[in-house]
Amino acid sequence: PVMLWAIWRTEPGQALSEKDAIRLCRYLVARWGAYNVVWILGGDGSYLGKYAPRWKNIGRGVFGDAPARPVTMHPGSRQWTGGDFRAEKWFSFIGYQSGHNDSEEAVKWLVEGPPATEWSTRPARPIVNMEPNYEEITSPQTGTHFDALAVRKAMYRSLLVSPTAGATYGHHGVWSWAETWEVPLNHDKFGKARPWYEAVNSEGSQSVKHLAQLFGSIRWWTLRPDREMVQNQPSTALQFIASARSEDG
């Protein structure tokens, strides 16, 4: 669960003092910590640069040096928390958001930026794309309506540009719990969402099922990115072909 949403100034991740944020999060850990959870300390906020000390202090105050469950951050689009947080003892894995943007610049950040170049930096941390483009969401930057093909591209790239650890799938109608064809609250720029009970059976969701079956049939934890496998890589990031091989070849 996300512990402190931090998109707007009115949300707890921004509105609460460090002391109160720690108190609230400690309560959440006490209430739910016995379950098999992954703690996402901050949700959709800015955690880098001048903001990093505040979030480090909150993380240390809540989890100390040895959290009983995995802990990470869910940053805003194309923010890399690895540089500021990977050495924190409470920080378990690097979560990032490639986001809902299919411009050349955005895709290049995924396939040539930190997820693809920083994975070997020590101390090593698993790397997970926690928010690639959601199915049937509309990109406010390009106007693209992301379909199942866009879902597959984002998922395979996310799983292969870094050592395979996982990726998430989202649908515009599911994250918002849309009950009819409607525009999600405060998200007008992303377009209308279909009802969640239709969205759960979408083509993209079936693609992710097959992807999970494929990776589950191999020793996915041994995969490492290997760009040399593709001899003629397209010149544009939008057509980038991700490739990986096992450690033993």
Where are these regions (language model features)?
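Generic recognition of flexible, low-complexity loop/linker segments
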Residues: R26-L28, T81-G83, P114-T117, A154-M155, ...
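Active-site mouth of glycoside hydrolases
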Residues: P1-E105
